[in-house]
Curated annotation (Swiss-Prot):
Protein's name in the database: Basic phospholipase A2 homolog CTs-K49a
Swiss-Prot/TrEMBL site (Hydrophobic membrane-disruption site (MDiS)) positions: L127, F130
SUPFAM superfamilies (UniProt xref): Phospholipase A2, PLA2 (SSF48619)
Compartment list: Secreted
């Protein structure tokens, strides 16, 4: 059962370089990224963009929009470099496309931190059955 859970988390946590994104989320929020955000709301995890349930879910919606704009990089395969300086994420590296991906992940981690006060534990495991499509554009 534990192996199944670990595999599910690896598949569901948001797209991109999971190690780097997970570190950013933990650094900004102090929360375990997989268990706190992997299945949160209607937009965190796999699937298309849906009507956000709250501000935290909107962070995931905006992250998917940010990834949609990326060019010449694969958020699933590619990785980037960043550092944690004076409690701030600093995207690095010479590749502008990877830096752009890093900025998407940075924005999501900061968004999660800025919305910790509205984080709803009841929404952290949402199977997306009652999520509605949205006409909201990126």
């Amino acid at each position: 059962m534990r192996t199944l859970w670990i595999m599910a988390v690896l598949l569901v946590v948001v797209e991109g370089s999971l190690v780097q994104l997970g570190k950013m989320i933990f650094q900004e929020t102090g929360k375990n990224p997989a268990t706190s955000y992997g299945l949160y709301g209607c937009n965190c995890g796999p699937g298309g963009r849906r009507k956000p349930k709250d501000a935290t879910d909107r962070c995931c919606f905006l992250h998917k929009c940010c990834y949609k704009k990326l060019t010449d990089c694969d958020p699933i395969k590619d990785s980037y470099s960043y550092s944690w300086v004076n409690k701030a994420i600093v995207c690095g590296g010479d590749d502008p496309h990877l830096k752009e991906m890093c900025e998407c992940d940075k924005a999501m981690a900061i968004c999660f931190r800025e919305n910790l006060d509205t984080y709803d534990k009841k929404k952290k495991i949402n199977l997306k059955l009652f999520c509605k499509k949205t006409s909201e554009q990126c």
